[in-house]
Amino acid sequence: MNVVQGNIESKNAKVAIVVSRFNSFVVDSLLNGAVDTLKRFGQVADENITVVKVPGAVELPLAARRVAACGKFDGIIALGAVIRGGTPHFDFVAGECNKGLAQVALEFDIPVSFGVLTTDTIEQAIERSGTKAGNKGGEAALGLLEMVNVLQALEEQL
């Protein structure tokens, strides 16, 4: 039986991190967690990490698509924070962001790691950006590193 799986270390990986500026007090912590994880666990060099900042979560898929289309990156991490308010706006933003990022991954055959928080409260977002519930930016980076290696292993074995 052949089992294909990836590891975390990926020294030569070129990674783009597409980041929403909206709710920056949360998203900046996600970005720090992602970059720290890429460097410490993935051994990714500074020069192989590119950060692209966009206004909000709705803009993440378009920026990710442009990054994927250039063909210079092995993977993309999308980071943002969508916090529920008193209107249905949350559902539209969160859903379209998720759907758009998944479409980019499938269209361009590139891993796109979803590090966009979708929470009911500001407190939940803060907990998930480096306090009680860990750092979801770091978790998104770990997932991306593994998928970069899984796809490389598949290419070699299939």
Curated annotation (Swiss-Prot):
One of its GO terms (molecular function) is 6,7-dimethyl-8-ribityllumazine synthase activity. SUPFAM superfamilies: Lumazine synthase. 5-amino-6-(D-ribitylamino)uracil binds at F22, A57, V58, E59, A81, V82, I83, F114. CDD domains: Lumazine_synthase-I. InterPro entries: LS, LS/RS, LS/RS_sf. Pathway: Cofactor biosynthesis; riboflavin biosynthesis; riboflavin from 2-hydroxy-3-oxobutyl phosphate and 5-amino-6-(D-ribitylamino)uracil: step 1/2. Keywords: Riboflavin biosynthesis, Transferase. The keyword Cytoplasm does not apply. Its EC number is 2.5.1.78. It holds the Pfam family DMRL_synthase. GO terms for biological process: riboflavin biosynthetic process. (2S)-2-hydroxy-3-oxobutyl phosphate binds at G86, T87, R128. It is an enzyme of class 2 (transferase). The keyword Lyase does not apply. GO terms for cellular component: cytosol; riboflavin synthase complex. The active site is at H89. Belongs to the DMRL synthase family. NCBIfam families: lumazine-synth, PRK00061.1-4. Forms an icosahedral capsid composed of 60 subunits, arranged as a dodecamer of pentamers. Catalyzes the formation of 6,7-dimethyl-8-ribityllumazine by condensation of 5-amino-6-(D-ribitylamino)uracil with 3,4-dihydroxy-2-butanone 4-phosphate. This is the penultimate step in the biosynthesis of riboflavin. This is 6,7-dimethyl-8-ribityllumazine synthase. It comes from Shewanella halifaxensis (strain HAW-EB4). The lineage of its organism: Bacteria, Pseudomonadati, Pseudomonadota, Gammaproteobacteria, Alteromonadales.
